[in-house]
């Protein structure tokens, strides 16, 4: 849960809300949300029991420490409890207490449109490996976008930098319009790495609107804003 959302909190404390994650409990559902202004990560988890409604903002630094302690134990059971101003995480013989971030979290519901003009279903590993290869051509600190050209039956991924260029195609299933769109490759990689499904669905409206990566049950939703780009020859 933490590993699947922590990467999209803000790197600095300029906006304290972006430096934490929203934990929203309603009945037997826990929604965890993080965002940094360029992307939103959402995980919906079904709980064993039902609880009263509650919204709290947990500091990202606390969650990062917990993630380090838990390590690769993805099935580790964590008990979470709240006081008025604090959150308590208990797992194994470890107890972590942290002060909550005060304030009201961002209202993101209006950003989560279910409308789309293009839907792509693609093998997650093929897409992730292709984008990983593209990043080898990007110098550290360079903000080169990866350009994705979606057409019937194929997704073309291009990148061009001072180091070199890449142009690869992946077989896909597509519904709707063709599309040419650019992204920060790191944002796509971060989301794809924590999705366990073999096939992933990507939803697009147009080249200026966010991409949504989500499953049918919406147990995960990743919103990623596109970037402007110059056409790659």
Where are these regions (language model features)?
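DNA polymerase processivity clamps
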Residues: 1-42, 49-101, 116-233
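Glycine-rich, pocket-lining loop/helix-strand segments that form or immediately flank
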Residues: 104
């Amino acid at each position: 849960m933490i590993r699947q959302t922590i990467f999209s909190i803000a790197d600095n404390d300029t906006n304290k809300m972006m430096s934490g994650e929203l934990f929203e409990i309603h009945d037997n559902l826990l929604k965890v949300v993080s965002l940094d202004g360029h992307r939103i990560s959402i995980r919906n988890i079904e709980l064993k029991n039902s609880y009263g409604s509650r919204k709290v903002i947990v500091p990202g630094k606390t969650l990062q420490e917990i993630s380090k302690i838990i390590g690769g134990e993805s099935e580790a059971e964590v008990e979470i409890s709240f006081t008025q101003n604090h959150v308590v995480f208990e797992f194994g013989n470890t107890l972590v207490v942290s002060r909550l971030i005060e304030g009201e979290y961002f209202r993101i519901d209006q950003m989560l449109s279910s409308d789309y003009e293009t839907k792509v279903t693609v093998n997650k590993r093929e897409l992730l490996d292709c984008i990983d290869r593209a990043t080898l051509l990007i110098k550290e600190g360079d903000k080169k976008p990866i350009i994705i050209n979606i057409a019937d039956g194929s997704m073309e991924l291009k990148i061009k930098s001072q180091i070199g260029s890449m142009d690869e195609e992946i077989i896909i299933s597509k519904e709707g319009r063709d599309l040419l769109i650019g992204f920060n490759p790191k944002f796509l990689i971060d989301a794809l790495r924590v999705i366990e499904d073999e096939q992933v669905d990507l939803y697009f409206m147009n080249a200026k609107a966010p991409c949504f990566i989500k499953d049918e049950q919406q147990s995960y939703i990743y919103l990623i804003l596109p970037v402007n780009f110059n056409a790659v020859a």
